[in-house]
Amino acid sequence: MTYVPAKDRYERMVYRRCGRSGLKLPAVSLGLWHNFGHDTPHDTKRAICRAAFDHGITHFDLANNYGPPPGSAEHAFGSILAEDFAGYRDELIVSSKAGYGMWPGPYGEWGSRKYMVASCDQSLKRMGLDYVDIFYSHRFDPDTPLEETMGALDYIVRSGRALYAGISSYNSERTREAVAILNDLGTPCVIHQPSYNMLNRWVERDGLKETLSDLGVGSIAFTPLAQGMLTKKYLGGIPDDSRAAQDKSLFPSMLTEDVVANIRKLNEIAEGRDQTLAQMAIAWVLRGGGITSALIGASKPSQVEDCAGAVGNLDFTDEELALIDQYADEEQINLWAKSSETDT
């Protein structure tokens, strides 16, 4: 049966301007980091993407290494584009990234022009696209001049492979340098993608959040649910099909008794707001307008629907924020800290 998206999809979502650019992103975007590799049935992937678009989620975020195996998420999304979204390409924002290991040898990762351009070409081929809307440097490369990496992004945009350039997990200092280089080249940095959630607030400590506001660069926060910790999933133990059980970027050692007790308190605050814990966690990331979009992952369509519902209440009282701060102790869950380091 031919897929027909919900007619009221744009009424279900809030759209925010990405920095000072003309690009608007949905307040909730869908990331394909997990659950889009060979370990997930194709029909499940299609159902997740359909549910997202039906709820006004127009932004689909990928990277060359997403899988497993690396590249398989882009292959899967390319099939879904052809099967379900072929007539809606101009309604979609598709992004990809390059920075992590993809092939053997010295040119298979990091930030050289050689790797960045080849990676973009491979991503386009896997997805069957002429261009992506956003292409990112996935991580800072301490061994490649920043001018070279940003020059590669400039070339990728100027050659028509991407419409916008972005960076991911760069700290405040490196972000200022990267943005200045891109501005000089005439291809502005439109967006930054850092990890950010109640339990991982490095963007506040580092000053990155303020830096992005000062520079007029948009932001999309990945892991707003702390890899699933900020949901009800782990309140009663570790489910067999969960990330923690499978050691997928969340480890059982992170879920101590004290951590789970605090998450239960956060869940009570969410219930008082008539939200699920996931919805409140997303709303918290989006509070005050400092973050353009929250980038979610999902293993089933119902999770997409739940997360999209966060836009129904993005406001917090001072009392709610104080209570959240009381129980949302920062945990050592920033797996990307090394990518954000200043030292070279």
Predicted regions located by residue number:
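N-terminal binding-site loop/beta-alpha segment at the start of enzyme catalytic domains
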Residues: M1-L92, R158
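Short acidic capping loops at alpha-helix termini that bridge into adjacent secondary structure
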Residues: P26-A27, D61, G87-L92, D130-I134, ...
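Conserved beta-strand positions
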Residues: L30, L62, S96, I134-S137, ...
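Short, acidic/polar
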Residues: T40-A52, G111-M127, T175-V179
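Alpha-helix N-cap and loop-to-helix initiation/capping positions
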Residues: T40-T44, S72, A76, Y107-Y115, ...
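Active-site groove signature of glycoside hydrolases
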Residues: L124-P145
